[in-house]
């Protein structure tokens, strides 16, 4: 397994690549560090046709989630661009951000699940861990 630690200022951002090529992006750091460091690195994945199999958000603190939110914004902007160009709109502007790779799935540590676990309450229906 290959582990790539991205500069994320106060937060975290790791890219895990398994031997079989499966990729997992854990957190995204701050928005600025995502744009400056992470987007460039994962942009090479898009150029080679490699996708991110799973994006994992450990929790919703801004130093972990803001980079992922920027990734989602970039993905949406490029999808709109591709649609417009594919529909013959040749004057539609190219997005400013680096094209990110496709993302197959997203997982997040939901607040509802955390509260249920910490309070000893019933686990949520959203797939959180369950106590026996």
Q: Where does each model-flagged region fall?
A:
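Flexible, acidic/histidine-containing loops and adjacent segments that form or flank the divalent-metal
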Residues: 1, 66, 70-132
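Conserved beta-strand hairpin/beta-sheet module of binuclear metal-dependent hydrolase folds
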Residues: 1-54
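Active-site environment of divalent metal-dependent phosphoester hydrolases
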Residues: 10-12, 31-33, 60-66, 112-116
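Extended aliphatic helical segments
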Residues: 26, 38, 55-57, 80, ...
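Low-complexity, flexible helical/coil segments
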Residues: 39-42, 60-64, 89-94
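Metallo-beta-lactamase
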Residues: 52-63, 86
